């Protein structure tokens, strides 16, 4: 190769001293032919040298780390992104010895991308021409980024302990929950901006970064599912038995609810750590003040009693406030109410009267309400992103978007949820059991949609399950329900998943059962199931004929959507003290 370079150097020097036009015609042809031949030879030598160089450096497709990386990425939805992102890491060959290593590297790369997005949003906030809603939406993005970073860090910690600290099934469910929530956060950020020209420029500035992180999270989720599914299959085979949960029920409660929390949820006499009373007879006059004063990062249950009264405020239980419990004096006596809404400049995310993010949150005997009304469009009464959270004897009252089951694992029992359009929506793994779900009278020309589930990826362990509940109309809608068609749900996102089972459905529900979101969007990729429902609106003969809709006839398939299976209820629900059923 050195000789070739020397030749071209001399050739260049020669040509610079002699004009090619002065060379005789035959010699000129010979010269050009020789020159072209040498170029080809040089190119071939260069390619061979490059290949040999890569072989010598160990960056070889036959190397073990390359095979592990390629195999791991092949299970993802975006394999090229998966491979290129990790292959670009310096000395990746020394770090990859297993699929677990690939996943951990992917999570660390994703964390860096999330941090990059954070600084991009901070830069956007310095713009002077932002609207009120754009500012609110950008702050929503900062909040969801903060949550995403926590989820990625927790996933790395869980992965480092895999598969020893917990059962395989617990590891699998926890990891899939964390990555599903991290993915959901990226869409939540973008959902805060409308698609119209008024604030499209801000959304466009964010979109590439958010979508990139969402794809990276999707890849990590797919690899986690592939790894844990494989390991559990090996365990089943080696043990020659079906892998089961360590504890399926504790007196009918999911096991993640400790005996102490079960008592708290059902006991009529509980000693609180703080008391809220609007008349000044407690420690605090507002719920928000009591939450702010609660210990952060607590591992013990911290109980806030909210005395009877109407509390006109917006309450946030942040991620730092863990294991908080609200106890009211009765669902008709303790009411937390607000009226934030999208029409007046809020985002859907920030419109919530009460927003709960802190892990292990419990509430009982309270009403969460948004009084904005149907003309104000999205106006959330309760938003929940708290993992392992549960609500008992609570009312959620609003119109459009009443209950926002945003992310993570959630359980609602003996609750009333009332609204109009998409009034139970989000991308949590949420089970509503023994609840009353009532459609209200909407604005003229509107249709009622009970659910709008937001699953964006086929590997997310999310969905809305309504079990052993009652679906009907409120007293204001019932006399005129024929004028307002009501459906069980519509697909908000591409892989929307909702199951209604063992519930009573009145004639309020349209015979088709389900409604489109926008034309054919998601009709082939959604999962809508019905199992053993009763009532005048439960007949399935007139239901939609979409590829994604099914009548579930197998008890085994239905069992997958019970609290014990769908939200890993056997590991945590028992601690709440709320009454529940884990199975069918």
Swiss-Prot record:
The keyword Transport does not apply. One of its GO terms (molecular function) is pectinesterase activity. Coiled coil: none annotated. It is an enzyme of class 3 (hydrolase). One of its GO terms (biological process) is cell wall modification. GO terms for cellular component: extracellular region. The PMEI region may act as an autoinhibitory domain and prevent untimely PME activity during transport. In the N-terminal section; belongs to the PMEI family. This is Pectinesterase 1.
């Amino acid at each position: 190769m050195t000789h070739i370079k020397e030749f071209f150097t001399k050739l260049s020097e020669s040509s610079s001293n002699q004009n090619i036009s002065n060379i005789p015609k035959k010699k000129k042809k010979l010269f050009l032919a020789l020159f072209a031949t040498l170029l080809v030879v040089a190119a071939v030598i260069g390619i061979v040298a490059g290949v040999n160089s890569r072989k010598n450096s160990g960056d070889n497709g036959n190397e073990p780390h390359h095979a592990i990386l390629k195999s791991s990425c092949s299970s993802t939805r975006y394999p090229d992104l998966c491979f290129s992102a990790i292959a670009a890491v310096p000395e990746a060959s020394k770090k990859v010895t297993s699929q677990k290593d690939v996943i951990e590297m992917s999570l660390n790369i994703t964390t860096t991308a999330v941090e990059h997005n954070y600084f991009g949003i901070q830069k956007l906030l310095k713009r002077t021409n932002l609207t009120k809603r754009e500012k609110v939406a950008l702050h929503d993005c900062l909040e969801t980024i903060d949550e995403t970073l926590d989820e990625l860090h927790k996933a790395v910690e869980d992965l480092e302990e895999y598969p020893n600290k917990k059962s395989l099934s617990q590891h699998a469910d926890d990891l899939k929950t964390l990555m599903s929530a991290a993915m959901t956060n990226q869409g939540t950020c973008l959902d805060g901006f409308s698609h119209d020209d008024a604030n499209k420029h801000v959304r466009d500035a964010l979109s590439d970064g958010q979508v990139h992180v969402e794809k990276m999270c999707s890849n990590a989720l797919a690899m986690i599912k592939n790894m844990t599914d494989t390991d559990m299959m090996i365990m089943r085979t080696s043990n020659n038995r079906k892998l089961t949960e360590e504890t399926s029920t504790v007196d009918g409660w999911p096991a993640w609810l400790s005996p102490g929390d079960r008592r708290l949820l059902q006991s009529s006499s509980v000693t609180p750590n703080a008391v809220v009373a609007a008349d000044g007879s407690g420690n605090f006059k507002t719920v928000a003040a009591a939450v702010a004063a609660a210990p952060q990062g607590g591992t013990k249950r911290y109980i806030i009693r909210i005395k009877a009264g109407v509390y006109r405020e917006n309450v946030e239980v942040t991620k730092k406030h863990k294991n908080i419990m609200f106890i009211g004096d009765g669902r008709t006596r303790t009411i937390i109410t607000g009226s934030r809404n999208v029409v007046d400049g809020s985002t859907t995310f920030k419109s919530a009267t009460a927003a709960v993010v802190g892990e292990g949150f419990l509430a009982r005997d309270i009403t969460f309400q948004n009084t904005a009304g149907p003309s104000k469009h999205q106006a959330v009464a309760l938003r929940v992103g708290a993992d392992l959270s549960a609500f008992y004897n609570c009312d959620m009252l609003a119109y459009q978007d009443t209950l926002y089951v945003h992310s993570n694992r959630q359980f609602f029992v003996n609750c009333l949820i009332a609204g109009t359009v998409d009034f139970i929506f989000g991308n949590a793994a949420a089970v509503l059991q023994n609840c009353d779900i009532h459609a209200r009278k909407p604005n003229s020309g509107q249709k009622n949609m009970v659910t709008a589930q937001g699953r964006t990826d086929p590997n997310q362990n999310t969905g809305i399950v309504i079990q052993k509940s009652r679906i009907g109309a409120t007293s204001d809608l019932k006399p005129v329900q024929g004028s307002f068609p009501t459906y069980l749900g519509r697909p908000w996102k591409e892989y929307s998943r909702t199951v209604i089972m063992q519930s009573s459905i009145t004639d309020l529900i349209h015979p088709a059962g389900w409604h489109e979101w926008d034309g054919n969007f998601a009709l082939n990729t959604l999962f809508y199931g019905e199992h053993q429902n009763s009532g005048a609106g439960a007949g399935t003969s007139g239901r939609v004929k979409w590829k994604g809709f099914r009548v579930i006839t197998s008890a085994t398939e239905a069992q997958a959507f019970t609290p014990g299976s769908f939200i890993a209820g056997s590991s945590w629900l028992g601690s709440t003290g709320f009454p529940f059923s884990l199975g069918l």
